[in-house]
């Protein structure tokens, strides 16, 4: 009997020793993992910077108030500035060093020469097909043309606002716009857009779904089209898809790092007629048209006032980014 009790006690003691050894081994292993992880974090922390998304715009509610979401403070002078101008400006100036001259003048306003970029574009139509706004602050000069008021207004609406867009398959599906912020945006070398509104039985209202010639033409051979139809009504669309792409888009709010300067014209183009566009005339401005040198001198003089009406953003805009998330 005593032998059995001794064996039980011995087994119990051996188990305690084994468990104690096991716990110490686990503790050492965990300490090793934790210390190594902390060491890696400490080593990488100085070279890793959190992404700065600039401004948060709420998906619902008021779009007027931006909320700061900056993870680091940067000196104003470290920002980049892009100035977009029509190619005719460079042609009229006819000076190979005009950009260097403007860079030196902007330096007097506090903008280092390496932070300012000049980008020309052929015309409003071609610029609207592939807008590329990559700088922290982007100023777009558009020379007023009475024959291009609609194109100028649509381009301003596109680049002064953020859009969330998805592809449309018009061969398989009908589409409807859910509210005033919902638009169909088309881009391409030639966009002709026709629509046929449908009733609840999917029969055409004033048109035949099998005859595209009976569709209503809302745009003809344009490069940029922002289409607005009656909300809550299904539509069958006909689009020149070989030369144009169309996306179903939702206007999210203002793109605060872009300003449009209208060169010439009696009044600033009004893009606020759309109920979804908050008044933003402070970022849609006009300068008197004289000569391009005079225009650029005016921009240099007021560049800091213009930038103060904007907000620095980290998100760039190009045609691909526009289509899926701006």
Swiss-Prot record:
Keywords: Calcium, Capsid protein, Disulfide bond, Glycoprotein, Host endoplasmic reticulum, Host-virus interaction, Metal-binding, Outer capsid protein, Signal, T=13 icosahedral capsid protein, Virion. Ca(2+) 1 binds at residues 95, 206, 214, 216. It is found in: Virion; Host endoplasmic reticulum lumen. One of its GO terms (molecular function) is metal ion binding. InterPro entries: VP7, VP7_1, VP7_2. Residues 253-255 are annotated as: GPR motif. Residues 165-167 are annotated as: CNP motif. Disulfide bonds join 82-135, 165-249, 191-244, 196-207. Residues 1-50 form the signal peptide. Gene3D superfamilies: Glycoprotein VP7, domain 1 (3.40.50.11130), Rotavirus outer-layer protein VP7, domain 2 (2.60.120.800). Glycans are attached at residue 69. N-glycosylated. The N-terminus is blocked possibly by pyroglutamic acid. Residues 237-239 are annotated as: LVD motif. One of its GO terms (cellular component) is host cell endoplasmic reticulum lumen. Ca(2+) 2 binds at residues 177, 228-229, 231, 301. Homotrimer; disulfide-linked. 2 Ca(2+) ions bound at each subunit interface in the trimer hold the trimer together. Interacts with the intermediate capsid protein VP6. Interacts with the outer capsid protein VP5*. Some rotavirus strains are neuraminidase-sensitive and require sialic acid to attach to the cell surface. Some rotavirus strains are integrin-dependent. Some rotavirus strains depend on ganglioside for their entry into the host cell. Hsp70 also seems to be involved in the entry of some strains. In group A rotaviruses, VP7 defines the G serotype. Calcium-binding protein that interacts with rotavirus cell receptors once the initial attachment by VP4 has been achieved. Rotavirus attachment and entry into the host cell probably involves multiple sequential contacts between the outer capsid proteins VP4 and VP7, and the cell receptors. Following entry into the host cell, low intracellular or intravesicular Ca(2+) concentration probably causes the calcium-stabilized VP7 trimers to dissociate from the virion. This step is probably necessary for the membrane-disrupting entry step and the release of VP4, which is locked onto the virion by VP7. Belongs to the rotavirus VP7 family. This is Outer capsid glycoprotein VP7. It comes from Rotavirus A (isolate RVA/Pig/Australia/TFR-41/1987/G5P9[7]). The lineage of its organism: Viruses, Riboviria, Orthornavirae, Duplornaviricota, Resentoviricetes.
């Amino acid at each position: 009997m005593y032998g059995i009790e001794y064996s039980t006690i011995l087994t119990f003691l051996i188990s305690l020793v084994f468990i104690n050894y096991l716990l110490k081994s686990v503790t050492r292993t965990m300490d090793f993992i934790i210390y190594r992880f902390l060491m890696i974090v400490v080593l990488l922390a100085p070279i890793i910077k959190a992404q700065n998304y600039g401004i948060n715009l709420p998906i619902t509610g008021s779009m007027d108030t931006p909320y700061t979401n900056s993870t680091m403070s940067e000196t104003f002078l470290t920002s980049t500035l892009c100035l977009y101008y029509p190619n005719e400006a460079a042609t009229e100036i006819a000076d190979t060093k005009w950009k260097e001259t403007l860079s030196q003048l902007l330096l007097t306003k506090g903008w280092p020469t390496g932070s300012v970029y000049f980008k020309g574009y052929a015309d409003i139509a071609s610029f609207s097909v592939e807008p590329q706004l990559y700088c922290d602050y982007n100023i777009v000069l558009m020379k007023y043309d009475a024959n291009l008021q609609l194109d100028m207004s649509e381009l301003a609406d596109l680049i002064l606002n953020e859009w969330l867009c998805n592809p449309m398959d018009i061969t398989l599906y009908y589409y409807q716009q859910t509210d005033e912020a919902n638009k169909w945006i088309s881009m391409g070398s030639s966009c002709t857009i026709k629509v046929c509104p449908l009733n609840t039985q999917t029969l055409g209202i004033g048109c035949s779904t099998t005859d595209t010639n009976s569709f209503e033409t809302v745009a003809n051979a344009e490069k940029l089209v922002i289409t607005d139809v009656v909300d809550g009504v299904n539509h069958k669309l006909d689009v020149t898809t070989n030369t144009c792409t169309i996306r179903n888009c939702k206007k999210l709010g203002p793109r605060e790092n872009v300003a449009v300067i209208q060169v010439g014209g009696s009044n600033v183009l009004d893009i606020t007629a759309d109920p979804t566009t908050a008044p933003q005339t402070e970022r849609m401005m006009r300068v008197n048209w004289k000569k391009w040198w005079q225009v650029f001198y005016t921009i240099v003089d007021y560049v800091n006032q213009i930038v103060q009406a904007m907000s620095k953003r980290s998100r760039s805009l190009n045609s691909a980014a526009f289509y899926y998330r701006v």
